[in-house]
Curated annotation (Swiss-Prot):
Subcellular location as annotated: Cytoplasm
Stretch forming the signal peptide: none
Transmembrane segments: none
Gene Ontology terms: biological process: methionyl-tRNA aminoacylation
Name of the protein: Methionine--tRNA ligase
Region (Disordered): 570-593
Species name: Nitrosomonas europaea (strain ATCC 19718 / CIP 103999 / KCTC 2705 / NBRC 14298)
Residues engaged in binding Zn(2+): C144, C147, C157, C160
tRNA-binding domain: residues covered: 604-706
Length: 706
């Protein structure tokens, strides 16, 4: 096996607030992938850091009467506590306010300047005459210049979705002091992203080497423009004093913008790890590095990671990312996380209420599919799925069999002829087990597919144990060998399932390692043609007495969690600092909502025949910018539908998915062929989406939606 050398990062949480369940989507996703790679025997380093610079940190520290350094030290300890509580195993968790990050920020800036990619220009900004500071976009409020909505921020309107500059706001005021800002001119430093060297490189990088998911590559194509077109703008990388950050070398009162040194924090954190562990930093970051570099991020910061970051690295003489993996936002019960509803749940409150962090790790894994789709934490489904899958299916296998092994057979599994008979049973009943499929799903970050495959296998094990009924056999003393085989089989299959679930459930896996009397659960690879029975525990293996591994979720625990967050947020809510976080990934953003359409009668509605459809095939449509051609199975027949969802979905990701279609819509002759219906998708008034609708589990092709 070829050993891969891999460096993995998660986006840096901002040092201006608590970790919440939206943030945890990314860190759990990354941690699962890293643990899987380490189980494969690869050399993997996982680094992260607090993103510590910027005006919000400076102002919050001032408000609390402490230094910014004291604030970020306190928040760093809180963040690390929360991550540790959810078993996020960083190899290094650091801070961007470090000598290492400063060194690489200055080095990259110097090299870009030497390459002629730094420009100095005078810009006009809004200035707070009371606080004596230039106001970032999110620190200015006023009336939207497009629709007139009040209390809008200086960069975009949450009512109509319009984008604008702070100087365009009507009746602006400072969100810091309440003063009316004045206009002042200041020299700023720009990274010349529009330079042909950057634009040409980004165009090549986007389309070569599979660096981005298909949805991200489509978004990059929009930002870059068509071939021969350059839609990129130069990037302002400086801020004026007063500011908490790194001063630009050779300048007075000019600081690096937080988004310049934030991704450089990956390098700073890894450099710290290298110093601790004796790792060769250059082997991972030099231009011709053969190692692998992966960034896990939220889709709302794709712009910074897929445009600015690779262009900076390339032109400063460093390697660029192997791949950037972007995930979607988290909603709770189908809605944006809400403080008033108690669904803006912090990591700390989840743990303080006594909820098992591995319940959430499993639920997120069951939802994450490697795409940029949003995921929903439906709290009722959360309770049902964890109780059904983890406790009812998986843990139940061990609890049904372990007691007999300990009490009747001294903790020893079968050996000799009975072991050979057990192997035959395994190969006969579980021929459909495909560890390679699970492995491929983990590699592709399609954890939902891995979980589905594992739980199907757990169902098969439970079905066989139910058929063998060891609790019935145990009543007949003449069937001791049969009882021993049945219970040994259950423990053996539980062992294999535990190997596959270890990246998701590391704490439970550690308990199982003790229960099964193992040094460490390792990934059980099954070679082509090799029987599954070759991957079992050896004959006569001795296990320890069974200790309870996991409890069910009591719905009352969820109610208590919601109540606790409602009470806490009412006491500590600080919307001013919360809204200024430059990395708001993991939480769905505010969006304008279209007005409700004209009322129709029930008679009108029932004319629409909505059916569950399985996407059998999905293809690009030559010459079409927005369309995908879908082949849909609606139970009784197959239909061809052209859907305008190309910007959001890669065809390969759609195959096998269920969706909803209008089945009785008149066929429409299009330039590319006949469209025999319409699939349903949601989209925002400000351009968000489209988001293909999907039914709940259990729905089948052809079922009518009513």
């Amino acid at each position: 096996m070829t050993i891969r050398n891999i460096l993995v990062t998660s986006a840096l949480p901002y040092a201006n607030g608590s970790i919440h369940l939206g943030h945890l989507v990314e860190y759990i996703q990354t941690d699962i992938w890293v643990r899987f790679q380490k189980m494969q025997g690869h050399t993997v380093y996982y680094v992260c850091a607090d993103d510590t610079h910027g005006t919000p940190v400076m102002l919050r520290a001032e408000k609390e009467g402490i230094s910014p350094e004291a604030l970020i030290a306190r928040v760093h300890a809180e963040h690390l506590r929360d991550f540790t509580g959810f078993h996020i195993a960083f190899d290094q968790y650091y801070s961007t306010h470090s000598d290492e990050t400063r060194y690489y920020a200055e080095d990259i800036y110097r090299k870009l300047k030497e390459a002629g990619l730094i420009a100095v220009r005078a810009i006009e900004q809004l200035y707070d005459p009371i606080k004596n500071l230039f106001l970032p976009d999110r620190f200015v409020k006023g009336e939207c210049p497009k629709c007139g909505a009040a209390e809008q921020y200086g960069d975009s309107c949450e009512a109509c979705g319009a984008a604008y500059t702070p100087t365009e706001l009507k009746n602006p005021y400072s969100a810091v002091s309440g003063a009316t800002p004045v206009r002042k001119t200041s020299e700023h430093f720009f990274f010349k992203l529009s330079d042909s060297r950057c634009a040409d490189f980004l165009r090549r990088w986007t389309h070569e080497g599979n660096h981005l998911q298909a949805e991200a590559a489509n978004k990059m194509a929009e930002w870059l423009g068509e071939a021969g077109e350059n839609k990129l703008s130069d990037w302002d990388i400086s801020r004026d004093a007063p500011y908490f950050g790194f001063e630009i070398p050779g300048e007075t009162g000019k600081y690096f913008y937080v988004w310049l040194d934030a991704p450089i924090g990956y390098m700073g954190s890894f450099k710290k790890l290298c110093a601790r562990k004796g790792i060769d930093f250059d082997a991972y970051w030099k231009k011709d590095s053969t190692t692998e570099l992966y960034h896990f991020i939220g889709k709302d910061i794709l712009y910074f990671h897929a445009l600015f970051w690779p262009a900076m690295l390339e032109n400063a003489g460093y390697r660029t990312p192997t791949q950037i993996f972007a995930h979607g936002f988290l909603t709770v019960n189908g809605e944006k996380m809400s403080k008033s509803r108690g669904t803006f749940i912090t990591a700390e409150s989840y743990l303080e209420q006594g909820l098992n962090p591995e319940w959430l790790r499993y639920y997120y894994a069951a939802k994450l599919n490697g795409s940029m789709e949003d995921i929903d934490l439906n709290l009722d489904d959360f309770v049902a799925r964890v109780n059904s899958d983890l406790v009812g299916k998986y843990i139940n296998i061990a609890s049904r069999c372990a007691g007999f092994i300990s009490k009747r057979f001294g903790g020893k599994l079968v050996s000799g002829e009975d072991y050979r008979l057990l192997q035959q049973m395994v190969d006969e009943h579980f021929a459909g087990w495909q560890p390679g499929v699970i492995e491929a799903a983990y590699e592709a970050r399609d954890f939902s597919a891995a979980v589905r495959h594992i739980m199907r296998r757990a169902d098969e094990v439970n079905e066989l144990i139910h058929e063998l009924a060891p609790w019935e056999i145990a009543r007949d003393e003449t069937r001791e060998r049969e009882l021993h085989r049945a219970c040994s089989l259950g423990i053996q299959m539980f062992y294999l399932l535990s190997c596959y679930l270890k990246p998701i459930l590391p704490r439970t896996a550690a308990q199982i390692e003790d229960f099964l009397n193992l040094g460490e659960l390792s990934w059980q690879k099954q070679q082509a043609g090799q029987p599954l029975s070759d991957t079992l525990l050896p004959p006569g293996h001795v296990i320890n007495p069974y200790q309870h591994l996991m409890t069910r979720i009591d719905p009352k625990q969820i109610t208590a969690l919601i109540t606790a967050n409602q009470q806490t947020m009412q006491q500590t809510m600080n919307t001013e600092t919360e809204s200024h976080s430059p990395q708001r990934h993991g939480q769905a953003q505010q969006h304008p909502v279209a007005p409700i359409a004209e009322t129709i009668s029930i008679e009108d509605f029932v004319k629409i025949d909505l059916r569950i459809a399985r996407i059998v095939d999905a293809q690009h449509v030559p010459g079409a910018d927005k369309l995908l051609q879908l082949t849909l199975d609606i139970g009784s027949e197959q239909r061809t539908v052209f859907a305008g969802i190309k910007s959001a979905y890669d065809p390969e990701q759609l195959k096998g998915r269920l969706t909803v279609m209008v089945a009785n819509l008149a066929p429409r002759k299009m330039k590319f062929g006949l469209s025999e219906g319409m699939v349903l998708a949601a989209s925002g008034e400000n351009g968000g989406g489209p988001f293909l609708l999907a039914p709940d589990s259990g729905a089948q092709p052809g079922m009518r939606v009513k």
